[in-house]
Design a protein with these regions (language model features):
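N-terminal cap/lid segment of alpha/beta-hydrolase-fold proteins
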Residues: 51, 59-111, 115
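Primarily recognizes the serine-hydrolase "nucleophile elbow" in alpha/beta-hydrolase
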Residues: 148, 185-257
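Sec-dependent N-terminal signal peptides
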Residues: 1-10
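Conserved strand-to-loop "acid loop" that flanks and positions the catalytic carboxylate
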Residues: 278-295, 324
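Mobile cap/lid helix-loop segments that gate and shape the active-site cleft of serine hydrolases
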Residues: 228-273, 279, 294-302, 310-314
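Cap/lid segment of the alpha/beta-hydrolase catalytic domain
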Residues: 111-195, 219, 239-240, 244
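N-terminal pre-domain segments of enzymes
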Residues: 13-63
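C-terminal catalytic histidine-bearing segment of alpha/beta-hydrolase fold enzymes
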Residues: 302-347
């Protein structure tokens, strides 16, 4: 089965990775030095499989930049709220590119505290929604986390909010990898803050922010806890395998230009991404009636990845909730998620 997939990709003009896993839900297997698929029996075995997954993601998304620039954080506005200070800032992610963001800092900080990267959904106001300045109240999670004592950073995704960005002129292979890089730089910003506990940094996001939370956590292991809401299903379950929605400039154009919208050609899938996060904590909100991300596919992804969390003896593990609602992050599930975060960050 493996060889035909490689041949098909070669005929499409792709440059496939050497190791192609035919079954993306079978995570506890790995190619050995001889090129044979063998069981994953140890953390070392999994580290090899994980590296193959990240390479496959790069094949679709493109590479990350190899050089960082100084963050050069600039504060544009500062507003004193009842329990925190809201700063409108920008930070540099690349030469000539600055990311607008809101930084929420609780008033009464003693010592070092946890910090959360808060990623917005598809909305014109971008970062303003998680910061509590508009949009849907159920998605004001940066505001709510700041009230709970977290430092919260909510950046704009390229082309949303105040972030003007021309994907056509971008040097990146995908909007997705540009977003990942911006979010890695956001973690750099949090790590540079004296009041942030660098061992207690997490990420939370809904929809667009839900899958971007997974993507950045896959590539940045400084992120110790992930909360993803309405962010994924397996590619074959996404609109019955019609993955065109993933192919815009904001996402991964190669899914169309190289892989011709054929899910069987795509070298990675979401069960594998979930696995890359282990042994760190992962909290999933996947509503039963989410028309964007079909819940059966979510459950299949979760079932496939659980073995990795067990293999690595994850202290926090992976928890998934399936509320009876549509594409939403309900009050009760957010409360459970926040309680879960508090436990994940316990010493």
């Amino acid at each position: 089965m493996l060889i035909p997939i490689l041949l098909c990709l070669a005929s499409l003009g792709a440059e496939p990775v050497k190791l192609r896993y035919p079954e993306k839900h079978s995570l506890l297997v790995v190619f050995d030095a001889k090129g044979d698929i063998v069981p994953v029996r140890s953390a070392q075995d999994w580290a090899m499989r994980r590296s193959h997954i990240l390479n496959s993601m790069h094949e679709v998304m493109g590479p990350l930049p190899t050089k960082k620039v100084p963050l050069d954080v600039k504060v544009l506005e500062e507003t004193a709220k009842e329990k925190y200070t809201l700063k409108k800032i920008t930070y540099a992610s690349e030469e000539g590119d600055r990311v607008p963001a809101y930084l929420l800092i609780p008033h009464k900080i003693v010592g070092k505290v946890p910090a959360m990267l808060c990623l917005h959904q598809t909305t014109s106001i971008g970062k303003g929604e998680p910061a509590g300045l508009g949009g849907l109240p159920n998605l004001h999670y940066a505001h709510e986390l700041a009230l709970r004592g977290y430092i919260a950073l909510a950046p704009d995704y390229p082309s949303f909010g105040d972030y003007q960005y021309d994907f056509k002129k971008s040097k990146h292979a995908s909007g997705t990898i540009k977003g990942v890089w911006n979010h890695i730089c956001a973690v750099d910003l949090l790590c540079a803050m004296e009041s942030v506990d660098k061992e207690k940094i997490g990420v939370i996001g809904h929809s667009l922010g839900g899958h971007n939370s997974l993507f950045v956590a896959a590539f940045d292991e400084r992120i110790k806890a992930v909360v993803t809401s309405c962010g994924f299903t397996s590619f074959p379950r996404y609109y019955n395998g019609n993955i065109k929605g993933w192919t815009s400039d904001r996402y991964m154009p190669r899914l169309a230009t190289v892989y011709k919208l054929k899910t069987e050609y795509v070298p990675f899938d979401f069960p594998e991404i979930l696995g890359t996060i282990a042994p760190r904590g992962l909290f999933i909100n996947a509503p039963m009636e989410d028309s964007n991300f079909e819940v059966v596919g979510v459950k299949e992804c979760v079932a496939a990845a659980q073995g990795v969390f067990r293999l690595l003896n994850s202290r926090t593990g992976m928890q998934a909730y399936y509320p009876e609602c549509k594409h939403d992050f309900p009050n009760e599930i957010r409360r459970i998620a926040y309680d879960w975060l508090a436990k994940a960050f316990e010493n």
